[in-house]
Design a protein with these regions (language model features):
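Non-catalytic DNA-recognition/assembly elements of restriction-modification systems
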Residues: 1-15, 27, 137, 141-181
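Sequence-specific dsDNA recognition surfaces
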Residues: 5-23, 36-65, 84, 89
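ATP-grasp fold ATP-binding core
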Residues: 33
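Short helix/loop capping segments that flank catalytic or ligand/cofactor-binding pockets
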Residues: 41-43, 80, 105
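A short glycine-rich beta-alpha junction/loop motif
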Residues: 73, 87-94, 124-147
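Short, charged beta-turn/beta-strand-edge "cap" motif at the junction between a beta-strand
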Residues: 75-78
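Short, positively charged
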Residues: 99-138
Length: 181
């Protein structure tokens, strides 16, 4: 058994650049993820984007492809995501950067398997939450061998979810064309 903190190379939580500064949001190209977008899924796109200025001037951090995410607050507390692109996040998400893709696959599926147990330990009044420190202390089994089978499964999930996103975009375009006739 090992803690998630010891299993991961690095753990980070994000931040929200000031919404009152349009230079942080207007024409942004850097994906910025809200905890409501973390739904036990592979994430290929985000609803919002920030600018390079926001990234350099605020405390949000660019997380690499393959980072494992856990929503920490509210209804989505305990839900897990796998970053299918480099992205930044808000402060309600804990990013877990693994040493390699095999470890990331293992951690993603382990957290999915224990998600209900983890989310049931969220504390708080009106809005339950998990702290980054709590997540760091979660104990998991360390894999005893290469997890290449899990990597293959995760690759299929990534491919399928990217295809689903493309199909949703096409569906939206077709519906817009049909309704404009």
């Amino acid at each position: 058994m090992v803690t998630i903190k010891d299993f991961c190379a690095e753990m980070k939580s994000g931040a929200t650049p000031s919404r009152s500064n349009p230079e942080y949001w207007s024409n942004g190209t850097i994906p910025w993820l809200k905890s409501g977008e973390v739904h036990n899924n592979v994430i290929h796109h985000t609803e919002e984007h920030i600018t390079g200025e926001a990234l350099s001037e605020c405390s949000t951090k660019l997380l690499p492809y393959g980072t494992i995410l856990m929503a920490m607050y509210g209804v989505t507390a305990g839900e897990v995501g796998y970053l299918g692109l480099p992205a930044t996040t808000n402060q309600a998400i804990c990013g877990m950067i693994c040493k390699n893709k095999s470890d990331a696959s293992w951690l993603f599926f382990t957290l999915l398997a224990f998600q209900k147990d983890i989310s049931s330990q969220a504390t708080g009044g009106a809005q339950s939450n998990l702290s980054k420190e709590f997540i760091e202390r979660i104990h998991i089994l360390r894999p005893q061998r290469n997890c290449s089978d899990l990597e293959k499964i995760l690759h299929h999930i990534e491919t399928n979810s990217a295809e689903i996103n493309k199909l949703k975009t096409l569906q939206d375009l077709l519906l817009a064309k049909i309704s404009s006739r």
